[in-house]
Amino acid sequence: MGIFSIANQHIRFAVKLACAIVLALFIGFHFQLETPRWAVLTAAIVAAGPAFAAGGEPYSGAIRYRGMLRIIGTFIGCIAALIIIISMIRAPLLMILVCCVWAGFCTWISSLVRIENSYAWGLSGYTALIIVITIQTEPLLTPQFALERCSEIVIGIGCAILADLLFSPRSIKQEVDRELDCLLVAQYQLMQLCIKHGDSEEVDNAWGDLVRRTAALEGMRSNLNMESSRWVRANRRLKALNTLSLTLITQSCETYLIQNTRPELITDTFRELFETPVETVQDVHRQLKRMRRVIVWTGERETPVTLYSWVGAATRYLLLKRGVISNTKISATEEEILQGEPVVKVESAERHHAMVNFWRTTLSCILGTLFWLWTGWTSGNGAMVMIAVVTSLAMRLPNPRMVCIDFIYGTLAALPLGLLYFLVIIPNTQQSMLLLCLSLAVLGFFIGIEVQKRRLGSMGALASTINIIVLDNPMTFHFIQFLDSALGQIVGCMLAFIVILLVRDKSKDRTGRVLLNQFVSAAVSAMTTNVVRRKENRLPALYQQLFLLMNKFPGDLPKFRLALTMIIAHQRLRDAPIPVNEDLSVFHRQLRRTADHVISAGSDDKRRRYFGQLLDELDIYQEKLRIWEAPPQVTEPVKRLTGMLHKYQNALTDS
């Protein structure tokens, strides 16, 4: 396929984007809005953003969800701007500086919340800055400007959603059904590898791939939930299926680790059962039936606990999978599974990274303010707006430098493209609404094709071109003003890029260490006799952290193995029959406090001291378990955990 070719699957979304832009333009001029450009720009960004992220037409619900986030972010930003202006109207410089700090604060928050919701916080940061900068000459018009901006943005979002509904968006349901089947087959094949106890690298690749696929399925669940309220039952089942899939991975990997020291635990009967190859979910179903019969014949005590748990989880997976595919009423058996254990959310390990993002956004906005005041450039405010937009959006993504480069390419491409529209197309079409709409529809169509290909600069070019062409009411054509706006965008993106290069993010190693220590803390916290605490389901949170670790350190197998071992230890200790008495309960609380001190320690020396204290306490705990005659199901996992912590002490304490 050539660089300028158009694939059939890209045409529908390109038409959808063109329709959203035309609707926003027509409504903006029909209702005599002062700046219809904001409505058009919002419609374009809301529609094109999910397509750029997905690398194709987004699934149903994605555009609506992004639109709702944009409305929320805009209202938060407008309220913040009004509060800042009312409080500091007599000190304009201080007012702008506080807005810069507000933009940084919103970026900090957006770095800590879920990636889907971070868009609203990033938007609220630069919305307040845009309002404060725009009303510098006429501060008394602030409420009117904020209201107009909110109205125009709501109109733009409404147009994007209407266009999405008109062109029958894709449903993700079929993809979910297909992935559920494939995932169960892959889970069975992973257990086959673990039973064979073959090459460790092959096993690592298999479970790593399953962790990624389970995370992707959770993302599909979020999309399905946004799509329609009729998938509420499927959404509940998919939440439980996420935990079951992670349980299957954990039990398979524990089976592999057990065979390192006690291969005789896996009997020949189960080895023969797992030698049968499977290709489809029906094959897996037949094999599970055979295994359940074997377990009934041999008895639960003669079955390795990991295999017994794996077969039970796979059976529940099959039951819920059928319910997701049919979307029927939830049965009593399913309800019992769904009413299982409350899922625990873990604290973010990226606090230092979030603080770096705060300083990047704040410093770049302050630098833009100083540049504007020092040069007195009429488009310095435009440069400041671009700085805030780029840094607020770039900081939420794994590679902010590439986002900045995308914006730089986009603003550079917008200069000749905007020039064509400003000098030739719009002056010759402004007398006819039909021709004006057609001209912008052509722009939206062709950029919509490139956005789906994730062409570098395409998203930036779309937003920057609409921002600089004359779409105000009434239209005025001042070439110097156009050139200033175009150059202001380019300068703003370049200043943001310079700040991102200068303020380096060295938080990667710290984040990795915090993640590993959080795994240790989770394993330690599983040693409890508190019934409520033992029922807490930390597995999704732990695997979410493991997925983050895999993204931060691709290919670092020792880190992944250590994290997985801690997850296995957590699950085993959580189900272990720990003796119930006050002496052990008090010591459990002491162990948790020490583990928390390891995570929160501000220096390597403190961390080493607390970690050494934790190891000493674990030795004392083992002695207490011996005194209280704890069974091997308790003492062996604690011994394995203590041995792992001794072995990896340096990796868990050094920066």
UniProtKB/Swiss-Prot annotation:
User: Which locations, inside or outside the cell, does it occupy?
Assistant: Cell inner membrane
User: Its Gene Ontology molecular function terms?
Assistant: transmembrane transporter activity
Q: Which example biological process does GO assign this protein?
A: carboxylic acid transport
Q: Name one GO cellular component term.
A: plasma membrane
Q: Which stretches are transmembrane?
A: 13-33, 38-58, 69-89, 93-113, 121-141, 152-172, 370-390, 407-427, 431-451, 460-480, 482-502
Where does the record place a coiled coil?
none
Q: What does this protein do?
A: Forms an efflux pump with AaeA. Could function as a metabolic relief valve, allowing to eliminate certain compounds when they accumulate to high levels in the cell.
Which family would the database say this protein is a member of? Answer: Belongs to the aromatic acid exporter ArAE (TC 2.A.85) family.
Among PANTHER family, the record links this protein to:
MULTIDRUG RESISTANCE PROTEIN MDTO, P-HYDROXYBENZOIC ACID EFFLUX PUMP SUBUNIT-RELATED
Q: What is this protein called?
A: p-hydroxybenzoic acid efflux pump subunit AaeB
Write down the species.
Salmonella typhi
| Taxon lineage | Bacteria, Pseudomonadati, Pseudomonadota, Gammaproteobacteria, Enterobacterales
